[in-house]
Regions:
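Active-site groove signature of glycoside hydrolases
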Residues: 1-4
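Short, flexible/disordered intra-domain loops and linkers
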Residues: 6-14
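Catalytic cores of secreted or luminal carbohydrate-active enzymes
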Residues: 209-247
Length: 286
């Protein structure tokens, strides 16, 4: 969507009239406006997209930082912690609100969630460009075998990683988004740029829904869990017990551990639920 904010010579505008018109159009008042805040010309506006108090943004930094953290990357704990609690370093909640960040780990571009934990490298040979198209910065991990395998340990680990990603996404503050088919392990067979594929590579394989019911039910449970705990959304009033709206924890309470090899982040969301007339406390561990 960033291309919509450039002027005649390609210079980014501070107040693009088209984006402003869309934001202020009365007919679109009840419509969700969501921007993929970058373009093919290299303009990257995550956290700086002209929002006019209406536009939300795909948070590409959430995708990158969470992918790196979930596969065990070093020195990324402090960044993952920020993404978990709503990316306040990118979106000031007092200015942009608490739902400006569209959190995602996968989307229509790139690997599916199953492929993210099945391939270390892209496999776009079928596109006809000698595997040169598509992004190379996938931050993926094949869990011990590249692509299709019958190894039960690898298959079990892949499903664990998918559950880790799902649980992380749905307990993060912000607005969650996941790719259709991720809830039943849909695959593109390692193709991370299937724009030209109208076949089994890009189609949803609904037969996998029955095969991977455990993953499907886990997604359903996590969606229910998120709806059940409004404190995760940041929509509650301040907690009467005095707990902070959001806090991070490590080995010691209220002390986040973000060292080189930090592997666990704990966040606590708190607030007063006016509907239930009591404090609501939610916890997330990644």
């Amino acid at each position: 969507a960033s291309i919509l904010g450039r002027n005649e010579d390609g210079t980014p505008m501070r107040k693009p009239p088209l984006l402003q018109a869309l934001a202020q159009d009365a007919i679109l008042a009840d419509t969700k406006l969501i921007a993929e805040a970058w373009d093919a010309g290299g303009l990257y506006q995550v956290g700086d997209f002209p929002a006019f108090k209406r536009w939300c943004e795909w948070n590409g930094k959430y995708r990158d930082d969470m992918r790196e953290y979930l596969k065990g990357g070093l020195w990324c704990g402090k960044y993952a912690a920020k993404r978990l609690v709503g990316s306040p370093d990118i979106y000031d909640p007092n200015i942009r609100g608490k739902d400006a960040s569209i959190n995602f780990i996968t989307c229509h571009d790139g690997f599916t969630l199953y492929d993210l934990y099945s391939y270390n490298e892209k496999h776009n040979e079928a596109n006809g460009w000698g595997n040169t198209d598509g992004g190379n910065d996938n931050r993926s991990w094949n869990c011990g075998a590249e692509g299709v395998t019958s190894d039960p340990e690898v298959l079990h680990l892949r499903k664990r990683m998918i559950k880790n990603a799902c649980a992380t996404l749905l307990t993060s503050r912000g607005t969650p988004m996941f790719l259709a088919g991720d809830e039943f392990c849909n695959t593109q067979f390692g193709n991370n740029n299937p724009y030209c594929q109208d076949n089994e590579i890009s189609w949803l394989d609904w037969g996998l829904l029955k095969k991977n019911q455990d993953i499907y039910q886990f997604f359903r449970y996590m969606i229910h869990f998120r709806k059940k705990h409004p404190a995760i959304h940041g929509l509650c009033q301040p907690a009467t017990c005095g707990l902070m709206d959001v806090s991070l924890h490590g080995v010691r309470p209220f002390e986040g551990d973000f060292g080189e090899d930090a592997k666990v982040i704990a966040a606590m969301f708190a607030g007063f639920d006016s509907k239930r007339k009591k404090d609501e406390i939610g916890r997330a561990h990644v």
